[in-house]
C-alpha cells in the first residue's frame, strides 16, 4: 500500500470534521521515510504534536492492518525551524528507544528563566564533548507537571543522538510494561540487553517505579550497570528523591548521588517568553494583548498553554477569522472558569497571611497598619484575578461599605505594582503558588 493512501482510507474510520480539521492537513514525506518509518508533515509543530499524540498509534495500526507491515509513525512540522540533523537520525537509534524523541524538544527551543536555569545548565553541560557520564551523573530533575521536565530530558536525548550515542528514553510506564511483557514471554535477556547496553538512559516520571519491589530491583541493577560503564542517567519526577513514596532507600540514595535540580513555576516574563517562542516556532501571530491575556489568565502548565494556542489557531483557520482578544477570551472562558472554581478567597487569604506573618482576622478587619493594608490589597487583587467573585461579594467578605471600596483598593495596589518591581514579583510568586496548589 502506498503510505499516502493510508490517510484517505482512514477517512472512513473518522467523522468528517475530525478528518478535515486534522488528518487532511498531513502530507506524506517520502524523502525522509523508510521501510519501517513513515514520516508525515503537518502545517506546524503544535498540530504535529497533537496529531502524533491523538492519531499516531491509530495510523500505525491501520497501516499494519491494511498492508501487513509494521512501521513507526512520525508526525513532524513541515515548517519546523530545526536543523537537518534532527531529521537524519539513524533508524536503529529510533528503534532502540521505548518512545520516539520529539525532534522539536531541543535546548534551542527551551526558554530559560530563573525558574529552570539550574536544571537547564546541568543538562546542557553534559552534552558537551566527553562530558556524558562523567560530569554530572545522575541528574535528577523534579517539579510540578507541565513545566518542561520532559522537554529538557528529550533535549539531552536529541543532542546525544546527534553525537552518535545510543539513547533509551522511557516513561516509568514504558519501563514497567517492557519488563512485564518480557517476563511473561520468557525473554528477560532481551529486556536487559535493551536497557543495560545504552550510552544514555532517560527515565520520565521515575516516581511511578514504586509499584513493586521486583521492578525496583531490576531498575537498581540497570542503574548500577549503566553508571559503572560511564553511561549517563537522567530522571524526572514530581518530587525530590527523599520525598518519593514507595521507592526503596537504596534507589533514593542512587538518585541523590549526583545533581538534583528543581524546576519551579515560571515568573510572568518567562511565561510570556515561552508563549512567544511557541508562536514563533509555529508561525502563529498573536498580539501582545492576547499573549499577556494567556499568560495572566492560565496556570503554568506549558502543555495547557500549547493547547490553548492550538485551539486559537484552529478556530482562526477553520472559521477564517483573525485571532483577536475577543476570540481568545471566548475560547478560554470555560477553561478559566474551571480554574477559578477550584480557587477560593479563603485559600488566597491563608497564603498571603502566611507570607506576611499576619492573622487573617487582621486582614479582614478595618485596621490601617501599612503591612496589613498591603496584605489586604494583595488578597483583593488576587481574588479579582483568580476567582469569580464580584466586587460586591468581595466588599461583603471584607465587611466594607460597598464595592467602591474594593475598586479603590484594586486601583491602589495596581499603582503600587507598576512602581515596585519587588512587589510585582512577590505577587506573581503568590499567584503561581495558588495556581499550582489548585491543580494538585
UniProtKB/Swiss-Prot annotation:
The UniProt keywords, alphabetically, are:
ATP-binding, Cytoplasm, DNA replication, DNA-binding, Lipid-binding, Nucleotide-binding
Note whether Cytoplasm occurs among the keywords.
yes
Q: Where is this region: Domain II?
A: 74-99
The UniProt entry's GO biological process terms, in alphabetical order, are: DNA replication initiation; regulation of DNA replication
Q: Region labeled Domain IV, binds dsDNA — which residues?
A: 317-440
- Primary role: Plays an essential role in the initiation and regulation of chromosomal replication. ATP-DnaA binds to the origin of replication (oriC) to initiate formation of the DNA replication initiation complex once per cell cycle. Binds the DnaA box (a 9 base pair repeat at the origin) and separates the double-stranded (ds)DNA. Forms a right-handed helical filament on oriC DNA; dsDNA binds to the exterior of the filament while single-stranded (ss)DNA is stabiized in the filament's interior.
**What family, per the record?**
Belongs to the DnaA family.
**Protein name as it appears in the record:** Chromosomal replication initiator protein DnaA
List the lineage, top down: Bacteria, Pseudomonadati, Campylobacterota, Epsilonproteobacteria, Campylobacterales
Amino acid at each position: 500500500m502506498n503510505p499516502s493512501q493510508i490517510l484517505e482510507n482512514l477517512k472512513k474510520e473518522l467523522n468528517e470534521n475530525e478528518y478535515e480539521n486534522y488528518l487532511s492537513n498531513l502530507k506524506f514525506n517520502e524523502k525522509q521515510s523508510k521501510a519501517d518509518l513513515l514520516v508525515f508533515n503537518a502545517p506546524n509543530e503544535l498540530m504535529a504534536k497533537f496529531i502524533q499524540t491523538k492519531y499516531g498509534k491509530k495510523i500505525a495500526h491501520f497501516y499494519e492492518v491494511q498492508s501487513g507491515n509494521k512501521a513507526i509513525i512520525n508526525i513532524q512540522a513541515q515548517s519546523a525551524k530545526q536543523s537537518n540533523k534532527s531529521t537524519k537520525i539513524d533508524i536503529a537509534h529510533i528503534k532502540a528507544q521505548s518512545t520516539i524523541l520529539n525532534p522539536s524538544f531541543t535546548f534551542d527551543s527551551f526558554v530559560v528563566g530563573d525558574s529552570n536555569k539550574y536544571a537547564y545548565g546541568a543538562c546542557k553541560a553534559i552534552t558537551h564533548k566527553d562530558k556524558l557520564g562523567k560530569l554530572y551523573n545522575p541528574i535528577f530533575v523534579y517539579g510540578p507537571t507541565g513545566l518542561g521536565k520532559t522537554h529538557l530530558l528529550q533535549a539531552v536525548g536529541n543532542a546525544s543522538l546527534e553525537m552518535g550515542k545510543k539513547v533509551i528514553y522511557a516513561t516509568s510506564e514504558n519501563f514497567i510494561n517492557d519488563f512485564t511483557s518480557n517476563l511473561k514471554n520468557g525473554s528477560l535477556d532481551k529486556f536487559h540487553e535493551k536497557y543495560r547496553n545504552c550510552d544514555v538512559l532517560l527515565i520520565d516520571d521515575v516516581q511511578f517505579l514504586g509499584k513493586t519491589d521486583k521492578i525496583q530491583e531490576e531498575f537498581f541493577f540497570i542503574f548500577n550497570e549503566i553508571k559503572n560503564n560511564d553511561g549517563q542517567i537522567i530522571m524526572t519526577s514530581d518530587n525530590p528523591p527523599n520525598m518519593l513514596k514507595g521507592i526503596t532507600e537504596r534507589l533514593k540514595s542512587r538518585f541523590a548521588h549526583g545533581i538534583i535540580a528543581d524546576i519551579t513555576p515560571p515568573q510572568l516574563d518567562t511565561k510570556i517568553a515561552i508563549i512567544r517562542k511557541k508562536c514563533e516556532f509555529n508561525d502563529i501571530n498573536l498580539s501582545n494583548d492576547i499573549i499577556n491575556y494567556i499568560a495572566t489568565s492560565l496556570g503554568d502548565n506549558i502543555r495547557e498553554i500549547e493547547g490553548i494556542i492550538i485551539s486559537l489557531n484552529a478556530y482562526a483557520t477553520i472559521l477564517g477569522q483573525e485571532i483577536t482578544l475577543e476570540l481568545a477570551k471566548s475560547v478560554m472562558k470555560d477553561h478559566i472558569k474551571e480554574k477559578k472554581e477550584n480557587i477560593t478567597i479563603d485559600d488566597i487569604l491563608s497564603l498571603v497571611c502566611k507570607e506576611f506573618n499576619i492573622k487573617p482576622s487582621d486582614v479582614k478587619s478595618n485596621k490601617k497598619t501599612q503591612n496589613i493594608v498591603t496584605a489586604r490589597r494583595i488578597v483583593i487583587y488576587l481574588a479579582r484575578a483568580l476567582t469569580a467573585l464580584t466586587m460586591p461579594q468581595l466588599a461583603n467578605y471584607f465587611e466594607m461599605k460597598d464595592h467602591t471600596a474594593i475598586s479603590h483598593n484594586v486601583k491602589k495596589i495596581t499603582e503600587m505594582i507598576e512602581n515596585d518591581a519587588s512587589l510585582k514579583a512577590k505577587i506573581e510568586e503568590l499567584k503561581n503558588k495558588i495556581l499550582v496548589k489548585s491543580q494538585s
